[in-house]
Amino acid sequence: MSSSSNTSSHRSYGLRRSQRSMNLNRATLLAPPTPSSLYDANNSTSSTSSQKPNTSFTSLFGPRKQTTSSPSFSHAAPLHPLSPPSFTHSQPQIQAQPVPRRPSLFDRPNLVSRSSSRLGDSPSLSPVAQVANPIHHTAPSPSDVRAFPIHKNASTGVKRSFFSSSMSNGAMSPPSHSPSPFLQSSQHIPPSTPAQKLRKKNNFDSFRISNSHISPFASGSFSPFATSSPNFLSTSTPAPPNSNNANPSTLFSSIPSSRHTTSNHFPSNSAQSSLFSPTARPLTARKLGFASSQTKSAVSNNHSRNSSKDASFMMKSFIPSNRSHPQTQQNESSLFSDNSMVNSSSNSFSLFPNATLPNPPSSELLTTPFQQIKPPSQVFMSTGLLSKQHRPRKNINFTPLPPSTPSKPSTFVRPHSSSTDSPPSPSTPSNTQTDSYFIQRENTPTNHNSIPTIQLEKSSMDFLRFDPPPSAVKTSHNYGLPFLSNQRCPATPTRNPFAFENTVSIHMDGRQPSPIKSRNNNQMSFAMEEEADVSQPSSSSFTLSFPSALTSSKVSSSTSHLLTRFRNVTLLGSGEFSEVFQVEDPVEKTLKYAVKKLKVKFSGPKERNRLLQEVSIQRALKGHDHIVELMDSWEHGGFLYMQVELCENGSLDRFLEEQGQLSRLDEFRVWKILVEVALGLQFIHHKNYVHLDLKPANVMITFEGTLKIGDFGMASVWPVPRGMEREGDCEYIAPEVLANHLYDKPADIFSLGITVFEAAANIVLPDNGQSWQKLRSGDLSDAPRLSSTDNGSSLTSSSRETPANSIIGQGGLDRVVEWMLSPEPRNRPTIDQILATDEVCWVEMRRKAGAIIYEGIHGSSSNPQGDQMMEDWQVNV
């Protein structure tokens, strides 16, 4: 082998394609090891070769130590004399047990490597297809590594036979596996850059997975230095793509001229690991998904055996070499344009477990864990405040809990439809025969056919499921709905859970019920001789129920006292501190009034002066259209009585509750509520008084729908005397009243603003909590938009034209309410400033009816005929 002496006379060049695909047939390898035969082998071409040389040289000749100055080769084939030899470095190859072998042609002790530059010049030691084959994942032990790698001469006959058979059957392949597709390739692509120097790697480098199909580096980002490019963890001769039937010239037709190599590391237990890992693969311009149909069964079997290792804690998986390569990014650049594996969950791989999962169909989007845990949107409201719409109505069969202020009445009146147990509905009685009222015992004969009566009787206890406390009062029958039939029985100052036997029901009827058999004389009947007025329409009977306090001797004396001054005394409601009766004037029968009676007597002169102050303030405010007028006041038996005008439509809070069940009020009616209440408050402030308890419960509604401010129990002169303390409703009270006891006119402005806010937003005001704090801080983000036109109208656009200067839906209501709810009292407007705004002036000019009367989205029509119709309606009503 004379060529071995000239190893240092040539420079290293890249291997030619023909040199790396030489036909190492049996005849050439079995030829005698003479210099002439070696020279003939050098002149052989690779055009007729269709198989790749065997790369498992390590498994045949045992392990050897790899250094930067002594490259190891899988096998050596003679080079053409005119072709410049080239070499590449490979990483250390380890094998636990060397394979016994006979001395071969390459076993020459004189061919000890001296330097990497000189070894590359040897024509007989040309690395044709260097492929490193890592057998183990651990570092080599000193006992398994030789001191110097010795390059052998040509192998013997036995060795050549095994070498050739391993090439034809596929090196290191199990018997059940098909031959490697790499052995069928006839062309190879040489690297366009010199091989990189091998750098030292740690024990965990075998866990790294370098993706050759998806690389974050473009073709222009190549660096020849191993430390500057992560694509070069190790180098070797490039391997063709994994395909059986694909033509290499076709597969790499789109590869750019500058082909950079990347390394792929796969586990040693792979079926084709001896041929494929680690290899230098050209970086293609597009992602290639090569799936071999012939090796699919081998891959699936090998992958199933290593399934436990695939799910490693490092979130990486060892993929067989003929499987689809990892796919970690999509649509990042032109390099990732192959969509062959985008929707494949079995052949795709990602460093993130859920990144390559297929998208579920649209029908299953609601069955994801997040969708199941997330509560439905109906659970929460969009505003954070409770709406009055579609809320269960309050049961009017029992008295609501006492209010936080003595001004809020409790209604006992409830409708009572006729039934078989009750008499027919009579005509409304009128007092024409006599003006005298008397208490009549049941044993007193009465002409029941001509005299309607008001029957007071003890309510029945038949509906109770528990035995009540013993009582001397017993009733045989009741002709009305029992009071508190579904009562929850809260313990309040005016009600006792065990005082049902003293509950009274007032039955107003057109005829006398059947005689009541009473066992004692404690049952009373208030009979009133009246003449039936046939001109009035008939009305259904109703029942008035109130607690036992009204049936005591005190209530009897107060009722008898009212009967001496008025006629048709009817209890309208009862609160914690007062009771309200509806009475008729004994002279003017058409005049009706409301009488307010305090439940407690004067506790002393100071208490008496405080109560009389309310009377004096209401007297001073007499004569305004939006102030409840005081008619008279007197004292009797230590109780204070006040006679005021009657507002037939009740209070504003009841109207808002009933209307809120259906929908929100239209904006024009909200503006009318603001205007009328502001007009009454302006009169109060101009008289140098402050109300300090302004709320919908204290705003009364007349028969015409006009609003009037009443209940001046918390009112005071302005400026407020020092040391005065008032407690109002926490839902409407101003923040400075609670914090600093500042009783001033801005406190009334805040109460007016929160009242308008409740009417416009149709929400239940919070009495505490975060929402309560946000309202006091001027934050209305939890509330819906107040200025809106989504309330709708039954009138068409042709009959109801929108005015050119309409303020409806322009956001004016939101601005005014937010202005009135300013946290700082000095930042709130005065009542005169509110009434001077353009919106209020526009509403005042267009409104024709009361505040609660619907006049359309934009108020009354500008058509004079429409105004005349409105006036005729008011007259007829």
From Swiss-Prot:
Kindly list the cysteine pairs connected by disulfide bridges.
none
Binding residues annotated for ATP, in chain numbering = 572-580, 596
Q: Which GO terms describe its cellular component?
A: Cdr2 medial cortical node complex; cytoplasm; medial cortical node; mitotic spindle pole body; nucleoplasm; nucleus
Q: Which family does it belong to?
A: Belongs to the protein kinase superfamily. Ser/Thr protein kinase family. WEE1 subfamily.
Catalytic site positions = 693 (proton acceptor)
Describe activity control: Negatively regulated by phosphorylation in the M-phase.
Protein name in UniProt: Mitosis inhibitor protein kinase wee1
Name its co-factor(s).
Answer: Mg(2+)
- According to its UniProt record, the EC number is 2.7.10.2
Positions of the UniProt region annotated as Disordered: 1-128, 165-198, 230-278, 319-340, 387-435, 775-808
Q: Does the keyword Transcription apply?
A: no
What does the UniProt function comment say about this protein?
Protein kinase that acts both on serines and on tyrosines. It acts as a dosage-dependent negative regulator of entry into mitosis (G2 to M transition). Phosphorylates and inhibits cdc2.
PTM statement from Swiss-Prot or TrEMBL:
Phosphorylated in the C-terminal by NIM1/CDR1.
User: Where are stretches of biased composition, namely Polar residues?
Assistant: 36-73, 85-96, 179-190, 251-277, 319-332
Catalytic activity, reaction form: L-tyrosyl-[protein] + ATP = O-phospho-L-tyrosyl-[protein] + ADP + H(+)
The main place the protein resides is: nucleus
Q: Which organism is it from?
A: Schizosaccharomyces pombe (strain 972 / ATCC 24843) (Fission yeast)
UniProt cross-references to PANTHER family, sorted A to Z: EUKARYOTIC TRANSLATION INITIATION FACTOR 2-ALPHA KINASE EIF2-ALPHA KINASE -RELATED, MITOSIS INHIBITOR PROTEIN KINASE SWE1
Among the Pfam families in the record, one is: Pkinase
Binding positions for Mg(2+) per the UniProt entry:
698, 711
